[in-house]
Amino acid sequence: YATPDFDSLKNFIKKFNEMAKIYYHEYGYKLAYHNHSEEFSNQFFGIEGKRKYDYLTEEFDPETTGFTVDSYWAQVAGIDVRALLERLKGRVRCLHLKDCEANHTVTTADGKTLHVPERIEIGRGTMNFPALIKTAEQTGVKYFIVEDEVYSTNNPLESVKMSADYIGSHLLEK
């Protein structure tokens, strides 16, 4: 969630907690916050050396809220995803599984070459999924969602099959 200043963040947290309370008490659901990379930035407002994600984890009501951790965006931000799950033990029920190709390059319109992490099919990148799944299960994660958003094959169904094949042969108990 993009917040231009600290007051906006506090207002967002207040409203999120208010909505979460309603959903939890009236319907039995917990609202979960899904991260991207910007919540982990060290440049966030420069307040007390905290990151935006630190404020969210401290200020969201643990009774009525939770977190959906996106493995790709956390890794892109330089976060150890397993350590994050351990820190949030019991508060993350859903984990988005995305892999990351570290040596991907793009050329900008002005001809510059940038090295940026790129999403790739599960099992083809740098994420250690067997260790991640083990930590996730030990910390209370119940649901795993594979997000194939970028297709190296230019064929979405082929890319999904590649991810499914990896999961079937490396992550599922036989």
Mark where each language-model region is:
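Histidine-acidic metal/acid-base catalytic patches
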Residues: 53-69, 73-174
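Active-site acidic/histidine proton-transfer and metal-coordination neighborhood
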Residues: 1-66, 157
